[in-house]
C-alpha cells in the first residue's frame, strides 16, 4: 500500500515516498539482522502459506491463528522440527546403501539450509583427517547434494546418529528483541 505522497521526476509522480507492504517481507524471506534498538532472527516462510493465512483472517474464515508456522526454505528438503518455543531443528538427509560387493556407503542428499558445498567439503575433510570417515566422493550437481561416504565407523549406525556424528543438524531460535520507548528491554518469542 503506497502513501499519497509521491516522488517526482521531471514534474511527474514516479514512485511513492513510502511503501507499506501488504505481506510481511521479513517473515517470507527470513531475516537475521540488528539495528539501533532492535535485533531479529526470523526464518523464511512459504509465501503461499502466509498469503492464505492473511486472506483467511481478512475474510473471517480463520478465527484461530495457528500456534506456529514451520519455516520453509527454497530448495531445502530436509527435516524441520519444532524443539521449543520458536526453536527449530534443521536437519540434513542421509541414506545407508549397499554398493558393489556388499560394501556400504552413506549418501548425503541434503544439508542444513545455511550450508553450501564448500562448508560440507571442509567438514568432510576434517572428518577424514580425524579418521571418522575413510573417504568420500562428491557427485553433487548445481543445487543438489549427492555425496558418497565410506565409513566403517558410521555405516551400521541409525540415520539419526549418522546425522549427529556428521554434524548435519543445526538449531535456530527465532526472536525479535527491542527497546521500548521507556528504555525497557523487550523480547518477543511468540
Regions found by a protein language model. Name each.
Residues 2-190:
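Intrinsically disordered, low-complexity regulatory segments
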Amino acid at each position: 500500500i503506497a502513501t499519497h505522497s509521491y516522488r517526482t521526476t521531471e514534474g511527474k509522480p514516479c514512485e511513492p515516498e513510502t511503501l507499506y507492504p501488504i505481506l510481511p517481507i521479513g517473515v517470507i524471506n527470513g531475516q537475521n539482522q540488528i539495528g539501533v534498538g532492535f535485533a531479529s532472527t526470523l526464518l523464511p516462510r512459504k509465501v503461499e502459506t502466509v498469503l492464505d493465512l492473511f486472506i483467511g483472517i481478512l475474510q473471517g474464515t480463520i478465527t484461530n491463528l495457528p500456534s506456529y508456522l514451520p519455516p520453509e526454505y527454497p530448495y531445502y528438503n530436509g527435516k524441520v522440527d519444532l524443539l521449543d518455543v520458536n526453536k527449530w531443528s534443521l536437519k540434513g538427509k542421509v541414506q545407508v546403501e549397499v554398493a558393489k560387493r556388499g560394501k556400504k556407503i552413506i549418501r548425503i542428499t541434503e544439508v542444513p539450509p545455511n550450508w553450501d558445498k564448500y562448508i560440507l567439503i571442509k567438514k568432510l575433510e576434517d572428518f577424514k583427517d580425524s579418521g571418522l570417515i575413510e573417504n568420500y566422493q562428491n557427485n553433487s550437481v548445481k543445487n543438489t547434494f549427492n555425496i558418497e561416504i565410506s565409513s566403517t565407523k558410521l555405516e551400521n549406525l541409525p540415520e539419526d546418529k549418522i546425522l549427529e556424528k556428521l554434524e548435519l543438524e543445526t538449531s535456530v531460535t527465532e526472536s525479535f528483541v527491542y527497546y521500548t520507548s521507556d528504555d525497557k528491554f523487550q523480547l518477543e518469542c511468540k
